[in-house]
Amino acid sequence: MRDIIKDQGLLSFLPQKLDAELVQGSTMVKHAFPIFQKGGVVMDVTNVTQAEIAEDAGATAVMVLDKLPYDVRKSGGVARMADPKIIEEVMNSITIPVMAKVRIGHYYEAKILEALGVDMIDESEVLTPADEEHHINKWEFKVPFVNGARNLGEALRRITEGASMIRTKGEAGTGNVSEAVKHMKIINGEIRSLISMSEEDRMKKAREYQVPYQIVELTVKLGRLPVVNFAAGGIATPADAALMMWLGADGIFVGSGIFKSQDPDVRAKAIVLATANWEDPEIVLEAQKMISESKSMMGIDIKALKPEELLQVRGQ
């Protein structure tokens, strides 16, 4: 595991010493767990039945929440973390890792999930933020966190706060991959810009991003984010998943795209197949043929959303 962390270049930035024993909750373990998810698909689920479908389809993990993002968007009101009893039932029914979402800034929802024993916490803009100004200080926790980002500044701020994994925000619950594409391209484009900058300009960028200069330098050295970066937000088909992998994602989160479709069992398997074999168009074609477009979730045009309906703007 130490070799994996060294390969990621994290030794020069992370605050804890990584030459110690491997202990649960250590920085090394928290940053290694997401690395083992690379190339896989994490699926949103709301109950045991969906979790079992996800596991059977080959998902590397599930994300438990009270409502799928599409339903969160439609129902309105305050979206909170899932019922701990449901999360526990899912944990007891499957063998793959179980993640769960908390509201941005809600320290105690995160503490509850840590006590419950989830494998990872998503501090998510899909839920109603508890703190409009600040995210959770994730260094205090033994469990690893994933956070969303639309650009490099957001990504590096979340990593500085202790996030072990980043995902594009996209626009969750829409079945529209366009925002995930945009966010992935922005992050990768801003990394390329950093690489071409002088040291003085990089220091200015660090101040602009409100992050330590060391993490900017580490990003330049690696030529990528210092942690795993998955794609999320609007992924609904095998082709969507393959596209995001082609754009540089390390893996895929699928929210409403599977269980708001009319063919969740086969769609889950098809998305896993396309993600694992994104470099082979013939296999992606096979995956796409497994599903029927007529059974896909009803998508939402991003342009039809009012500014206050956008989830991605939460937590900058």
UniProtKB/Swiss-Prot annotation:
SUPFAM superfamilies: Ribulose-phoshate binding barrel. InterPro entries: Aldolase_TIM, PdxS/SNZ, PdxS/SNZ_N, RibuloseP-bd_barrel. The active site is at 101 (schiff-base intermediate with d-ribose 5-phosphate). GO terms for biological process: amino acid metabolic process; pyridoxal phosphate biosynthetic process; pyridoxine biosynthetic process. The keyword Magnesium does not apply. Its EC number is 4.3.3.6. Pathway: Cofactor biosynthesis; pyridoxal 5'-phosphate biosynthesis. Coiled coil: none annotated. PROSITE patterns: PDXS_SNZ_1 (PS01235), PDXS_SNZ_2 (PS51129). Keywords: Lyase, Pyridoxal phosphate, Schiff base. D-ribose 5-phosphate binds at residues 44, 173, 234, 255-256. One of its GO terms (molecular function) is pyridoxal 5'-phosphate synthase (glutamine hydrolysing) activity. It holds the Pfam family SOR_SNZ. The keyword Metal-binding does not apply. D-glyceraldehyde 3-phosphate binds at residue 185. It catalyses: aldehydo-D-ribose 5-phosphate + D-glyceraldehyde 3-phosphate + L-glutamine = pyridoxal 5'-phosphate + L-glutamate + phosphate + 3 H2O + H(+). Belongs to the PdxS/SNZ family. In the presence of PdxT, forms a dodecamer of heterodimers. HAMAP family: PdxS. Catalyzes the formation of pyridoxal 5'-phosphate from ribose 5-phosphate (RBP), glyceraldehyde 3-phosphate (G3P) and ammonia. The ammonia is provided by the PdxT subunit. Can also use ribulose 5-phosphate and dihydroxyacetone phosphate as substrates, resulting from enzyme-catalyzed isomerization of RBP and G3P, respectively. This is Pyridoxal 5'-phosphate synthase subunit PdxS. It comes from Sulfurisphaera tokodaii (strain DSM 16993 / JCM 10545 / NBRC 100140 / 7) (Sulfolobus tokodaii). The lineage of its organism: Archaea, Thermoproteota, Thermoprotei, Sulfolobales, Sulfolobaceae. The gene is pdxS.
